[in-house]
Structures are given as C-alpha cells and as structure tokens.
Regions:
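Sec-dependent N-terminal signal peptides
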Residues: 1-12
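Aromatic-Pro/Gly-enriched surface loop or interdomain linker
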Residues: 13-69, 73-76, 166, 174-175, ...
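Short alpha-beta junction capping motif
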Residues: 17, 69-108
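Solvent-exposed loop/turn segments at secondary-structure junctions
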Residues: 22-26, 75-79, 97, 104-108, ...
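Sec-exported extracytoplasmic/periplasmic mature domains
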Residues: 43-47, 93-96, 115-119, 207-208
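Surface-exposed patches in mature extracellular/periplasmic domains of secreted proteins
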Residues: 49-57, 100-103, 121-129
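Short, surface-exposed beta-strand/loop micro-motifs that present aromatic residues
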Residues: 59-60, 151-167
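Acidic, glycine-rich loop-and-strand cores that form catalytic or ligand-binding grooves
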Residues: 112-143
C-alpha cells in the first residue's frame, strides 16, 4: 500500500520538500533558514516550483510518502525505532530520497541508525562523475567545503539500492550551513553560492531520477 501511495504522491506533490524530524535528542530543527533559502535559489535557478514554506515530517509518519525528497541535519544524537527505520526504508526503496547534512557531530550517530534502515547496505563514497555532481551545476571536484571545523576533505557518501542512489550524505562539508542566511555564519558569498548550487543539484537529481 505504501509503495502505491508513494508512486501517486511523487506525481501529485512533485514540488514539495520536507525536513526530517527524528528522536534521540539531536537538533533536527537546526539551520532554520537553510531549506527556505535553498528552495528560493532552486526556484530561481533550476525552475522548480517548490512551496516556499517547507514542513517537517516525522521518520515514522505515513506523511513521509508525500515528499520526493526529505532533508536531515543536526549536531547530536539520532535514534530510529525499528518501526521508524522500516518506514524510512520502504520510503527510500519506493522512490523517495534522503539528503543528510553532517552539521558536525551527527556522523557517529547517523551511521548507526542507517544500519537499522539498511542492515546489508554500506555507505559508499560517490564518484565525482555521478549525476548528482553534474546536474545544472558541475562539481567535478566533488563537494565544496563550506564550514571549516578541521582539515578533513569533504566527502559525499551514498546508499545505493539496486543501483539507485536513495540517500546522499554530505560529510565534512557542512553544506546546509551554506544555505543559511548570510548573517548566521558570515560565509563569503562565493562559498554560499557553491553550497546553494550543490543543494539545487541534489533537488534536481531527486526530482528527475
């Protein structure tokens, strides 16, 4: 039933996105200006028609199936119940897409929870030749470094189900920080533009895959 519902939803609500709400104590609501700014940029630059007021959706909710893409971020702990993990798994294998932005502190928690969702699938680094880096905007060197916490190189990881990328995880990039209002982190305009361009690539890929 959920698989059928998703196929209907993706055609009916193809211009809607949501922020993923989760338990565990982490701040799923971090970067409140990020998604609205990304939506505005995408609507202007890749001709999407996304609602300017994104909603939040819980991991275990059937409403998850209304959205072709959901965004997840935070700094701390993440916890999925078995039912939530199953709901997210069905959503992803049925055509949904999850973007996770490591807001520095999320990594050690989200990796454990993703194993609940896909016990037999490992996160893999995505090659720069992958279409997600080559939509309207080309990133032939991979993810841009947005927020410098250390000297680690930014990496894009993914979960692939039957050859299809269902989850994109930006690690050590802090991509969603670059989507926020300029006054929040004082990132240079050039850095913010790169972040928004990569973000719009993610949306474009999720909508057209």
């Amino acid at each position: 039933m959920k698989i059928l519902f998703l196929s209907i939803s993706l055609s009916t609500f193809a211009q809607e996105v949501a922020v993923l709400k989760y338990n565990g104590g982490g701040d799923w609501y971090a970067n409140p200006t990020a998604i609205p700014n990304l939506i505005d940029f995408s609507n202007k630059n890749i001709k999407t028609l996304i609602s300017k007021n994104p909603t939040s959706v819980s991991v275990g909710s059937s409403d998850l199936f209304n959205f072709p893409i959901v965004f997840m971020t935070g700094h701390g702990n993440v916890f999925f119940t078995d039912k939530e993990a199953e709901n997210l798994r069905v959503y992803l294998i049925s055509g949904g897409f999850l973007h996770i932005s490591d807001n520095y502190g999320l990594d050690k928690y989200i990796r454990i929870q993703l194993k609940k969702v896909f016990p037999k699938i490992e996160l893999k680094e995505i090659p720069f030749s992958h279409p997600i880096f080559n939509q309207t905007f080309t990133f032939n060197k991979g993810l841009p470094k947005i927020h410098e916490h250390n000297k680690k190189v930014p990496q894009g990881f993914g979960l692939f189900f039957k050859g299809r990328l269902v989850c994109f995880y930006d690690y050590e990039s802090d991509l969603s920080d670059g989507w926020e209002d300029s006054t929040v982190h004082n990132n240079p305009m050039e850095t913010r533009i790169k972040a928004l361009q990569m973000g719009s690539n993610i949306i474009e890929y999720a909508f057209r895959k």
